C-alpha cells in the first residue's frame, strides 16, 4: 500500500515541501533563516490576534487599551512584548536571510528573489503601520514624518498624503485604517511566502559553493527538520531572554508618553530596523532626493542579479568580493548607528559618506572587483 503522505492531495503538498524534498547535503546554518522567518510570522500572527482582541483603534482609547493589555489582561504584558520584540527578531532573521542570498548568489533564482524583495517591502509596511497603533509620541510623530515624505511627489504629493491620512493631519481616520492594514498585511505576507516557496522548489536550494548539487541531494526530513528545530529553539531562547529580561531595550521611551500633536519629540526616529534607510533619507538635504534615495536603498536589491559580473555564483572562493561584502555590512551597521543620532556635526558628514559608500559598493565596486577576479582566474 502506498504511503498516505504521497497520495493524499493535501499531504502530498506538505510531503513535497518539508519531508521528501531533495536538499543539498552541504547547506550551512545560514540556510536556517527561511524556516525561522516562517516561525516568526506564525508567532506574530498569533500574538497579534490575541492583542487585537483587547485593542481599540481609536485615538482617545488606543494608548489606554495598550496599558490595559499590559496591566489587566492575563499575561497581556507577555503577549505585547513578545509581539514587539518578535518584530525585532523577524527583521534580524530577514536581514540575515538577505545577506545570505547576497553572499552565496541565491539572487540568481530571479523569481524567488523578486518575490523576496516584495516580501521585504510588505513586512516593512506592516511593521511601520504596526508601530503607529500604540498611539504614543513616537507612534504619532513617526507616522506624521514618514507619511509626509509622499508630499515630495510632484503635483499629486499633498493630495496623496491627505488621502492616506483621511483628513488634514494624522488623526482618528489614520489610526483606524492603519489598524486595518496591520491586520490584513500578515495574511498577504503568508500568501506571498507560499509563492516564494513555490518558485524556490521549482529550482531547488542553492548551496555555499554555488555549484549545482543535483548529484548530491538528501531528503529534507530528518536531516534538515532536526537542524531547523535547533535553530527554532535558539530563536525562541533569544526572544524569551529579550522579552523577559529587557523588554524595552529596543523600544523608544517616548512611546510611553501618549501622542500629543502640540509637542514634538526632540529626536524623531523609527524602530532600529529602519534606521539604516532613515540615515540615507536624512543624508540628502533635498526632500525629493532623500525620498528617492530611501526608495532606492531597498529597491536596489531588485537590480542585484543584473549586476552579477562574476563567472562564479557564490563568494565562497572570492576573497576580494568577500572583503567588499563585509565592508557593506559594516557600512549598514554604521548607517544604523547614524540613523539613531541627532542631526549635527560629525554625524551629518559620517551619514553622507556612509550613504555614498553604500551605493558605491553595490553599483560600482562589487561588479568591478568581480571582473578583476575573473581576470585573475583567467576566466
From Swiss-Prot:
Binding positions for a ubiquinone per the UniProt entry: 201
Localization annotation: Mitochondrion inner membrane
Keyword check for Metal-binding: yes
Gene Ontology BP term (one): mitochondrial electron transport, ubiquinol to cytochrome c
Membrane topology: Multi-pass membrane protein
Top-level taxon of the source organism: Eukaryota
Protein residues bound to heme b b562: 83, 182
PANTHER family: CYTOCHROME B
Function: Component of the ubiquinol-cytochrome c reductase complex (complex III or cytochrome b-c1 complex) that is part of the mitochondrial respiratory chain. The b-c1 complex mediates electron transfer from ubiquinol to cytochrome c. Contributes to the generation of a proton gradient across the mitochondrial membrane that is then used for ATP synthesis.
Subunit composition and interactions: The cytochrome bc1 complex contains 11 subunits: 3 respiratory subunits (MT-CYB, CYC1 and UQCRFS1), 2 core proteins (UQCRC1 and UQCRC2) and 6 low-molecular weight proteins (UQCRH/QCR6, UQCRB/QCR7, UQCRQ/QCR8, UQCR10/QCR9, UQCR11/QCR10 and a cleavage product of UQCRFS1). This cytochrome bc1 complex then forms a dimer.
Entry's family note: Belongs to the cytochrome b family.
Note: Heme 1 (or BL or b562) is low-potential and absorbs at about 562 nm, and heme 2 (or BH or b566) is high-potential and absorbs at about 566 nm.
Name of the protein in its database record: Cytochrome b
Species the sequence originates in: Peponocephala electra
Amino acid at each position: 500500500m502506498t504511503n498516505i503522505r504521497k497520495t493524499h492531495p493535501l499531504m502530498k503538498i506538505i510531503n513535497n515541501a518539508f519531508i521528501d524534498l531533495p536538499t543539498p547535503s552541504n547547506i550551512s546554518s545560514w540556510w536556517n533563516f527561511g524556516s525561522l522567518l516562517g516561525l516568526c510570522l506564525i508567532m506574530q500572527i498569533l500574538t497579534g490576534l490575541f492583542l487585537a482582541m483587547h485593542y481599540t483603534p481609536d485615538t482617545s482609547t488606543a494608548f489606554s487599551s495598550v496599558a490595559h493589555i499590559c496591566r489587566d489582561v492575563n499575561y497581556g504584558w507577555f503577549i505585547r512584548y513578545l509581539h514587539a520584540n518578535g518584530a525585532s527578531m523577524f527583521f534580524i532573521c530577514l536581514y540575515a536571510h538577505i545577506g545570505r542570498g547576497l553572499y552565496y548568489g541565491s539572487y540568481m533564482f530571479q523569481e524567488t528573489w523578486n518575490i523576496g524583495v516584495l516580501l521585504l517591502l510588505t513586512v516593512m509596511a506592516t511593521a511601520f503601520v504596526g508601530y503607529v497603533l500604540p498611539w504614543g509620541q513616537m507612534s504619532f510623530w513617526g507616522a506624521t514624518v514618514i507619511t509626509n515624505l509622499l508630499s515630495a511627489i510632484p503635483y499629486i504629493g499633498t493630495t496623496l498624503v491627505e488621502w492616506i491620512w483621511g483628513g488634514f493631519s494624522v488623526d482618528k481616520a489614520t489610526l483606524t485604517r492603519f489598524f486595518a492594514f496591520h491586520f490584513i498585511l500578515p495574511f498577504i505576507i503568508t500568501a506571498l511566502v507560499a509563492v516564494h516557496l513555490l518558485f524556490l522548489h521549482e529550482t531547488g536550494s542553492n548551496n555555499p559553493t554555488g555549484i549545482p548539487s543535483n548529484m548530491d541531494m538528501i531528503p529534507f526530513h530528518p536531516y534538515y527538520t532536526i537542524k531547523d528545530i535547533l535553530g527554532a529553539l535558539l530563536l525562541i531562547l533569544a526572544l524569551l531572554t529579550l522579552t523577559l529580561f529587557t523588554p524595552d531595550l529596543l523600544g523608544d521611551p517616548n512611546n510611553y508618553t501618549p501622542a500629543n500633536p502640540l509637542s514634538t519629540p526632540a529626536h524623531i526616529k523609527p524602530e532600529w530596523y529602519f534606521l539604516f534607510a532613515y540615515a540615507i533619507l536624512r543624508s540628502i538635504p533635498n526632500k525629493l532626493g532623500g525620498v528617492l534615495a530611501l526608495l532606492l536603498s531597498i529597491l536596489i536589491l531588485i537590480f542585484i542579479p543584473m549586476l552579477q559580473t562574476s563567472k562564479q555564483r557564490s563568494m565562497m572562493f572570492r576573497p576580494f568580493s568577500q572583503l567588499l561584502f563585509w565592508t557593506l555590512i559594516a557600512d549598514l551597521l554604521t548607517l544604523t548607528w547614524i540613523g539613531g543620532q541627532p542631526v549635527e556635526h560629525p554625524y551629518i558628514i559620517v551619514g553622507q559618506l556612509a550613504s555614498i559608500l553604500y551605493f558605491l559598493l553595490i553599483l560600482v565596486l562589487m561588479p568591478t572587483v568581480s571582473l578583476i577576479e575573473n581576470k585573475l582566474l583567467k576566466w
